[in-house]
Amino acid sequence: MNINDKIGIYPGTFDPITFGHLDIIKRACKLVDKLIIGVAENVNKHTAFDTKLRTSMAENEIKGLGIDADVISFNGLLVKFAKEQNASVIIRGLRAVSDFDYEFQMSWVNYKLLPEIETIFLPASEDTQFISSGFVKEIARLGEDVSKFVSKGVQNELINLNRIKNGE
């Protein structure tokens, strides 16, 4: 790691991590010298998986793909976390126009808080643009196959989650 290296943060709840997230991660790695995947301990959002498991799933996914990135959980303001990690850029994925409105507002707030940290938006690839963690959890809850959206390891975690919820 060089002092002049560009560090990027790709934040999210990753509840669970999907092929859409992995697509953005692969592409983001080409834009920065070091990528940090920030797993948010989001107190305002109920998550199916705890932070430790979401972090572990993300680590397993990137390791399995040979991606060189760090996975770090964080709580609080994203820009504060980015500053602590010496990041100069936040990378966000956009699935559809509906994502843009929210993400644009957040990037403006982040800029007002720390103008030295830029936000880059990466549009989702055509084959991942409609994948969402929420849809994946719902499909899995209904007992359907989610292999088009998540890896086998994540599928197994979803199966375990549903067994626990069903008292099995």
From Swiss-Prot:
Keywords carried by this UniProt record: ATP-binding, Coenzyme A biosynthesis, Cytoplasm, Magnesium, Nucleotide-binding, Nucleotidyltransferase, Transferase
The protein's annotated pathway: Cofactor biosynthesis; coenzyme A biosynthesis; CoA from (R)-pantothenate: step 4/5
Class of the enzyme per the UniProt entry, highest EC level: transferase
Main location: cytoplasm
Pfam families reported in the protein's UniProt record: CTP_transf_like
Localization, UniProt: Cytoplasm
Residues with site note (Transition state stabilizer): H21
SUPFAM superfamilies: Nucleotidylyl transferase (SSF52374)
Signal peptide: none
Summary of the function given for this chain in its UniProt record: Reversibly transfers an adenylyl group from ATP to 4'-phosphopantetheine, yielding dephospho-CoA (dPCoA) and pyrophosphate.
Subunit structure: Homohexamer.
Protein name as catalogued: Phosphopantetheine adenylyltransferase
Taxonomic lineage of the native organism: Bacteria, Pseudomonadati, Pseudomonadota, Alphaproteobacteria, Rickettsiales
Gene name tied to this protein: coaD
